[in-house]
């Protein structure tokens, strides 16, 4: 069994997200979420410490809109197509 050091439980989801950055809007998909942050799959992840504004399309109701900061990211690799680009973000409530 893996030792997960997270303090808050995460839920697996598949919610579309629009990320507003200093360079414009980027589309992605939230694949897991907690009260403190989320993992977002996208073609061109931002780098750690970059700030962004998220608009997450929830299945019911109004979208979640929140400022966030990138904690870590994984870039696509031309040598390994099993690596999925994405990033972990922390919500700035």
Stretches found by the model and what they are:
Residues 56-58, 70, 91:
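Hydrophobic beta-strand positions in extracellular immunoglobulin-like domains
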Residues 15-20, 49-64:
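Short conserved beta-strand and strand-loop elements enriched in small hydrophobics
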Residues 1-35:
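N-terminal helix initiation/capping motif
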Residues 39-42, 74-91:
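Short, solvent-exposed secondary-structure boundary/capping segments
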Residues 13, 26, 52, 64-66, ...:
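Hydrophobic core residues within well-ordered beta-strands of beta-rich domains
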Residues 28-29, 66-73:
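Short beta-strand-centered aromatic/proline hotspots
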Residues 34, 70-74, 93:
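A generic structural motif
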Residues 8, 41-45, 61:
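Short, surface-exposed secondary-structure edge patches
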């Amino acid at each position: 069994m893996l030792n997960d050091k997270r303090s808050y439980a995460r839920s697996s989801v598949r919610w579309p997200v629009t990320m507003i950055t200093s360079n414009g809007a980027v589309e992605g998909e939230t694949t897991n979420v907690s009260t403190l942050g989320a993992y977002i799959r996208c073609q061109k992840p931002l780098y750690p410490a970059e700030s962004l504004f998220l608009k997450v399309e929830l299945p019911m109701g109004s979208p979640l809109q929140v400022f966030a900061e990138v904690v870590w990211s994984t870039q696509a690799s031309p040598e390994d197509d099993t690596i999925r680009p994405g990033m972990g973000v922390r919500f700035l409530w």
